[in-house]
Structures are given as C-alpha cells and as structure tokens.
Amino acid sequence: MYKRQTKNDAAWHGYPSISTFSSTAPSGITDLLGSFGCEHSMNAYSYHGSTLATASIFNVKYIISNKLLPESNLFNFYYGSDGEFLYENKYTLPVGFMVDSAIEDRWITNSPYNGIEVQNSFYKINTGIEDVFEQVYEFRTDTEVNFTPYTNAHMYAVVRNVNCDTVTVTINGKMYTYSGLKNGNRIIDIGYVTTEDSVILAGDTSMNALV
C-alpha cells in the first residue's frame, strides 16, 4: 500500500477511485461532487469532504486513512502498513442504480456550502427516510468551540464561512488538521465520538459551523 501523492494515484497504481486531476474533467461530475460537499475545482475533484453516505452512493468499497478509525458496524479494518490504514466499506450501492423519477424536480442541490442537506434530500426522495443526518449544534461566529457530544454518534462538521480555509479537530488531546476548505470540501469528518469524549473545533477564522 502506497502513501497518497496526488489525486491521480489511482491511475498511477491501477485502481478505480473517486479522486482525479484532469484538464478534461467533466463539469457535470465536478458539479455533482461539489453539491454533495466534496472537494472540487475546474479540473479536479476528490473524496475529501465525503461522508459514509456519499461513499455508499459512489460505490467506494475501500477507504485509505492516515489515522486509525474507531470500530464501526459500517466498515471493517482490512490492512495497515507504514501509517496507512485500509478499511472495507460494508454497505455500498452498485456503480449504477435506479432513482425515483421525482429527483429531477424535488432534489435540492443548491444548498450553499451544505452538502449534508443535499445528501439528506437525495436519501429522502429515493428511500423515504428523512434526516439521515441530524443537526445537533450550531456555532455561527465562533473561531474555536469545545463540546462534549450529548450522544454516541458518528459526527460531521459543515464549515459554511467561505473565508475559513483550515480547521483543526482535537479529540481527547489528539489533533487532526483539515486544510484547503476553499476548494469546496467543507464537510469535516469528526468521526465516531462518545459522551466521554472532548471535541475541539478551531478555524483560522470564524467557522459558521454546523455539527
């Protein structure tokens, strides 16, 4: 297993991936991933900013992480080497699948800087399930916040201030840095946390964050 070098690692090493850099990247795919909250630009898009829900939609069967992930009923540890860890996603949709015809008229894809709402709308139309994700906190003007989760859950943060480019997440004293948020990947995977954990979110400016 190789450490990530570029967005074209998949082409380099010969495996399919959701990430790519190409001068001929189709704008439709770029726009779609952007609406879901993933990193995107004029000639590139990537898995950054994805959730377990979008991983399922895009048939992402394996996730390479540079940190150990908590045990989950959604994915299994598969392999690890030299600080890189491979996880198998247990629940993925096929590459092609049917959707409700109502999606053309009812799917909300223009929710500014909130791919979570777009994902909720997608699942509601196609499955009838409301609020796959539920908002539990809102921090409008804070540059740094500290909270203890009120329940055990897998949590994500959505950073809506377009001027905020770097956020650190500190869980029980261990810090993770997320940068390049101005590329559109404004969903931060906090991970699975419990009521015993301490979580600190800190941005390089006010975050206008939802959790």
PLM feature spans:
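Short acidic/polar micro-motifs at solvent-exposed secondary-structure junctions
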Residues: 6-19
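Surface-exposed beta-strand edges and their flanking turn/coil or helix-capping segments
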Residues: 13, 27, 33, 99-102, ...
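Conserved small/polar residues in nucleotide/adenosyl-binding loops
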Residues: 1-5
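A short acidic, often aromatic-flanked loop/helix-cap motif at beta-alpha or helix-coil junctions
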Residues: 6-7, 25-27, 83-86
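Flexible, solvent-exposed extracytoplasmic
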Residues: 20, 54-211
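Luminal/periplasmic acceptor-recognition loop/helix of membrane-associated glycosyltransferases
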Residues: 17-57
